[in-house]
């Protein structure tokens, strides 16, 4: 990993910044990205660059968390709106919107409609490989952990 990392020209702070650096600034030969960002890159470069998405056979299932913070929603008198939004996300219509924006839908019927967009991958979770998000954070990103070891200049 350290050898691979030594070839990184720009390390942006997030996925969208990395996408911009790769697509708009033309820096780098490979972009390792979230699936939705890869599809956006393909869409953005379709007319002027030769970009291809390479799907691994195994990948991590990264699901953004969604929740209603009841106390905050009640304070702002938006509890019903927040609850309805959450319900919408898991409705067929919401899942369709999710898929159109290149996020993997969990609704099987919607997923089958987008099977050409979302390749069949063996997906694992953080719990599968680290036991918990806390364990993964400590192992990979705490001071002196794997990320620090990979990125150190020594």
Residue ranges and their predicted role:
Residues 1-56:
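Ligand-binding pocket segment of bilobal, Venus flytrap-like solute-binding proteins
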Residues 11-12, 31, 56-59, 75-82, ...:
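Solvent-exposed, acidic/flexible segments
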Residues 36-40, 58-61, 72-74, 104:
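Solvent-exposed loop/turn segments at secondary-structure junctions
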Residues 45-46, 58-60, 115-118:
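A generic structural signal for short, solvent-exposed coil/turn residues
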Residues 62-66:
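Small-molecule pocket liners
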Residues 72-154:
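Extracellular/periplasmic juxtamembrane helices and adjacent flexible linkers that interface
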């Amino acid at each position: 990993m350290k050898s691979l990392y030594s070839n990184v020209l720009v390390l942006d702070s997030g996925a969208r910044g990395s996408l911009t650096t790769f697509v708009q600034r033309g820096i780098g030969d490979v972009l390792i990205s979230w699936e939705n960002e890869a599809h956006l890159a393909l869409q953005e470069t379709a007319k002027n660059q030769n970009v291809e998405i390479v799907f691994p056979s195994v990948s991590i299932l990264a699901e953004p968390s969604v929740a209603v913070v009841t106390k905050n929603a009640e304070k702002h008198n938006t509890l019903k709106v927040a609850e309805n939004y959450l319900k919408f996300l898991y409705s067929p219509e919401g899942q369709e919107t999710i898929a159109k924006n290149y996020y993997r839908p969990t609704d099987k019927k919607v997923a089958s409609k987008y099977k050409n967009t979302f390749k069949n991958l063996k997906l694992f979770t953080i719990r599968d490989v680290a036991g918990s998000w806390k364990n993964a954070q400590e192992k990979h990103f705490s001071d002196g952990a794997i990320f620090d070891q990979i990125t150190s200049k020594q």
